[in-house]
Amino acid sequence: MHSTVHSFRTPEGVTLGVEHFGDAAAPLVLLAGGTTMLSWPDALCETLARGGRHVVRYDLRDSGASTTVDPAAPAYTLRDLAADAAALARGLDDRPAHLAGIGVGGMVAQVAALDHPDTFSALTSPGRGPSHRAQSTTTCPTTTRRR
């Protein structure tokens, strides 16, 4: 299956390295966990695309083909990374996207889904943090409904 690689520039000026698989219908945005987008295997992306998804994987800030931030610049947060994901998803289609993240990408995906509920239709977040035994430092609703 053919994929396309390009750059996406967020409204804040961050450039994200992005790869697309499949048609433009039914977007699925994949967030990697602490490494490059290549942690989502090509075979998985291709299989999902053959199933009718527009699979989009990308490098978070400071990884792979995305913007590398100057260490002297102000720090960024999970909320900034979540805003990057939302900007990318909004740039794909008028319809909400399914969002999936692993590791750090899972934490970013959760914040993105909470901060930008109209941008995402679903969230898949296996392995969302460093330890399943870690205590939560935030309180999240057990369910979120669209209005």
Q: Which residue ranges define each predicted feature?
A:
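An N-terminal hydrophobic leader/cap segment in hydrolases
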Residues: 1-7
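Conserved HGGG/HGGXW glycine-rich cap/lid loop of the alpha/beta-hydrolase fold
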Residues: 7-68, 74
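A structural alpha-helix within SAM-dependent methyltransferase catalytic domains
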Residues: 45, 86, 114-117
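Conserved acidic catalytic loop of the alpha/beta-hydrolase fold
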Residues: 79-97
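Conserved hydrolase catalytic core segment
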Residues: 95-138
